[in-house]
UniProtKB/Swiss-Prot annotation:
Residues 32-66 are annotated as: Disordered. The gene is TIM50. Residues 186-329 form the FCP1 homology domain. This is Mitochondrial import inner membrane translocase subunit TIM50. It is a single-pass membrane protein. Expressed in young cotyledons, roots, flowers and leaves. Residues 32-48 have a biased composition (Polar residues). Essential component of the TIM17:23 complex, a complex that mediates the translocation of transit peptide-containing proteins across the mitochondrial inner membrane. SMART domains: CPDc. It holds the Pfam family NIF. Residues 26-84 are mitochondrial matrix. It comes from Arabidopsis thaliana. Its main location: mitochondrion. The keyword Aminoacyl-tRNA synthetase does not apply. GO terms for biological process: protein transport.
Amino acid sequence: MASIVLRSRLLPRLAKLRSRNLRCFSAEASSTNSTSRYSGVTSTQSMFSDFPPPNQPPPPPPPQVEAAAAAATGKERKGLKYLGYALLWALTGATAATGYASFAYTIDEVNEKTKAFRESATKTPVIKSSGIDVIDKYQTKLYSAAMTGSARAIDKYLELREIVEEQVKGFTEPLSEKLLPDLHPAEQHVFTLVLDLNETLLYTDWKRERGWRTFKRPGVDAFLEHLGKFYEIVVYSDQMEMYVLPVCEKLDPNGYIRYKLARGATKYENGKHYRDLSKLNRDPKKILFVSANAFESTLQPENSVPIKPYKLEADDTALVDLIPFLEYVARNSPADIRPVLASFERKDIAKEFIDRSIEYQKRKQGQLGQGRFWRR
């Protein structure tokens, strides 16, 4: 009993002592922790106090440094500006020189004029390692690089120009070097009569109320039918093929025209399409070109036979009037038609031929009369 009473008295005291010890321990621990925490923060701040806080701009440089940097930047910008101007002037000069060379000289002439320069550029000067200044050495290297670069640029220009001229040639030159097939051996003596289309055999007109209309020239049927017996007849026009072929089919249903040549067979030069008679695969001594614009529309005016342009005149007889001269040529077969045509001096051949024929008949009759007189 006494032990129970003693135990009940001691337990509350032990509990109080225990709670006091816990309070002291916790207070010391808390003071220790707080002290260590604040001391840690303070030490950390002191260690990194020389660096700016995060996400803050750096301090401005001193005024002298800033002024020097601005001056250096200004010089760099000025240097780049001058360099840009120099490159622009160099590019402009190169473009102008290229354009002038392309306009003034052919590719063969440019190749011949620059041949010596390009050959000298390939001979790079030998740089000796001893006995030469460093500046001279670099100057020699720069000179060699400039010469080599210029020579390569010229080679590239010639290559590109050749490619471009080949492409342009496909549009300006006739489709083939031989526009007509070979003449049959039995027809080697036959002359070739080349006829223009517009204002020569027909006339194309446009009016608002009816649109385009094509009119045959008076006498064209008789002209083709009669001369088809003596000549190889070829139509050579500067119009598109889609126009030439159907028009010729309606113009010549009997097939007196053997071949039809359109714009693709012409040579484009100085903004105009020319007939190149040298590409017909025929003897130029036996070619006659009849056109209302004969001397202006062919590259061989010495083969031209001019005729009055047809402009829908009802009394036009130019084709019929030309038949006697063309028949005379076909029957007599001159060795070269070109001096014969040159003797007419670009006059109206049909009228001039009739006048010459009449004069010849008069002279012939006079000679016959004189012969009879002497025989008496």
